[in-house]
Amino acid sequence: MNKAEFIDLVKEAGKYNSKREAEEAISAFTLAVETALSKGESVELIGFGKFETAEQKGKEGKVPGSDKTYKTEDKRVPKFKPGKTLKQKVEEGK
């Protein structure tokens, strides 16, 4: 599903009057999640899931086919843990 199709789905599910309203709702939601995660906070929507950050350790490696090595730094990355209800809905959709 692409963004335009998702906007249509949100418009119907949320009973918005226009695609613009649905797109604004999606933008507000994503901005709120981005803001919370950038502050190190988590966002938990009971039944749907939890957005949080995790520390990803740096690693060392070797470039295949050469003797060059590289090292990456530690960084914070976003994570999503699906909730029980979401898992059940996905399972039912099989």
Curated annotation (Swiss-Prot):
* Gene Ontology cellular component annotations, sorted alphabetically: cytosol
Q: Its domain of life?
A: Bacteria
- Biological process per Gene Ontology, one example term: chromosome condensation
Q: Where is the composition biased (Basic and acidic residues)?
A: 68-77
The record lists the membrane-crossing segments as: none
Gene Ontology molecular function terms on file: DNA binding; structural constituent of chromatin
Annotated region described as Disordered, given as residue ranges: 56-94
Mark out the compositionally biased spans (Basic residues). Answer: 78-87
- State a single Pfam family of this protein: Bac_DNA_binding
Subunit note: Homodimer.
Quote the function comment for this protein: Histone-like DNA-binding protein which is capable of wrapping DNA to stabilize it, and thus to prevent its denaturation under extreme environmental conditions.
Tell me the protein's name.
DNA-binding protein HU
Organism field: Helicobacter pylori (strain ATCC 700392 / 26695)
